[in-house]
Amino acid sequence: MTNIQKLEASGYTRFSAPAKLNLFLKVINKRKDGYHNIQSVFQLIDLHDDIFIKLREKDKQINIKNSSLLIKPENDLTFKAAQLMLIDRQLGADIVINKNIPIGAGLGGGSSNAATVIMAINKLGKINMSKIDLIKHGLRLGADIPFFINGKNAWVEGIGELLNDIKITNSTYVVIVPNLSINTKTIFS
């Protein structure tokens, strides 16, 4: 039995957290709140992380096991997303992340994982928040999270929260990831 089969057999539900490409990025200006207004086209791609989630009743603890040792729990957007969704509920969560999206490659892995956890807890916990409310919640954690909650290729403006769905012709992309990691915050500073 594979690890995936073991997780699914023990009550975990599997979700896919896709990566994205910025087909172009134009930084318009820096805002007073420290964010930047941008224009971009975000394209979802097939590369994805696997997220396994199991909710527990009457236990508010959140446990995350990440296949990447590079992510510190206190910096993990996935943990913050679970906290945000479970804060006023008598639910806890066990989350296992199988990383395939390279960290620091600009592919949105952390934001995608957080968005996936927000949507998964909404579904599994029968919270029934609307997509608009999920997007508002996600924006509190990161500018790319609304895009992943929306789940469609988009023309993006503002800090990333203004989304206009677009059709992009089928294309093939080659993603080359050098042995280099870049923090998004560093790029925009």
Task: Label every PLM stretch briefly.
Residues 84, 88, 120-124, 140:
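Active-site catalytic microenvironments for nucleophilic, acid-base chemistry
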Residues 28, 58, 69, 100-102, ...:
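Residue-level signature for short turns and capping positions that connect secondary-structure elements
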Residues 93-106:
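Short pre-catalytic strand/loop immediately N-terminal to key active-site residues, enriched for Gly-Thr
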Residues 2-16, 22-40, 127-189:
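ATP-dependent small-molecule kinase catalytic core of the GHMP/sugar-kinase superfamily
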Residues 38, 64, 70-71, 103, ...:
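Short clusters of hydrophobic/aromatic residues that line enzyme substrate/ligand-binding pockets
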